[in-house]
């Protein structure tokens, strides 16, 4: 079970975008995530008339390592660590380690 999932609101802990908040757009693999509005780079795109693509400079988000982000805790209004526990009915759920509140209600 992944501690950071698509759609989660996260805070960047390290790098040029430290302190910025954004939603996770997708997980690239087990170790990297793409966060909305974070780690934006300019890519030079060659025109491709077969696909109808116009060339130029495109700004897009690039993946960052999952260790450089933390889940945003709305109750505490800060980044927080996440743990995983098994409930009585056998379901695995994520919880915030600072206050024990469940992430997945």
UniProtKB/Swiss-Prot annotation:
A GO biological process of this protein is: translation
For this protein, the record's PROSITE patterns field holds: RIBOSOMAL_L24
The UniProt entry's GO CC annotations, sorted and at most eight, read: ribonucleoprotein complex; ribosome
Superkingdom of source: Bacteria
Coiled-coil positions? none
Identify the keywords attached in UniProt to this record, alphabetized.
Ribonucleoprotein, Ribosomal protein, RNA-binding, rRNA-binding
The family database entries (Gene3D superfamilies) matched by this protein are listed as: 2.30.30.30
Listed GO MF terms: rRNA binding; structural constituent of ribosome
Alphabetical list of SUPFAM superfamilies matching this protein: Translation proteins SH3-like domain
- CDD domains, per the entry: KOW_RPL26 (cd06089)
Short name of any one Pfam family annotated for the protein = ribosomal_L24
Subunit field text: Part of the 50S ribosomal subunit.
The family annotation for this protein states: Belongs to the universal ribosomal protein uL24 family.
Q: What is this protein called?
A: Large ribosomal subunit protein uL24
Taxonomic path = Bacteria, Pseudomonadati, Pseudomonadota, Betaproteobacteria, Rhodocyclales
Which gene specifies this protein's sequence?
rplX
């Amino acid at each position: 079970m992944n501690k950071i999932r698509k759609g989660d609101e996260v805070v960047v802990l390290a790098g040029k975008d430290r302190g910025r908040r954004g939603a996770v757009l997708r997980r690239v693999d087990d170790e990297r995530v793409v966060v909305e509005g974070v780690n934006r780079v300019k890519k030079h795109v060659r025109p491709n008339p077969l696909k109808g693509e116009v060339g130029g400079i495109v700004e897009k988000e690039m993946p960052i390592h999952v260790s450089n982000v933390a889940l945003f805790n709305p109750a505490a209004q800060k980044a927080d660590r996440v743990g995983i526990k098994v409930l009585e009915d056998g379901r695995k759920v994520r919880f915030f380690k600072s206050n024990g509140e469940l992430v997945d209600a």
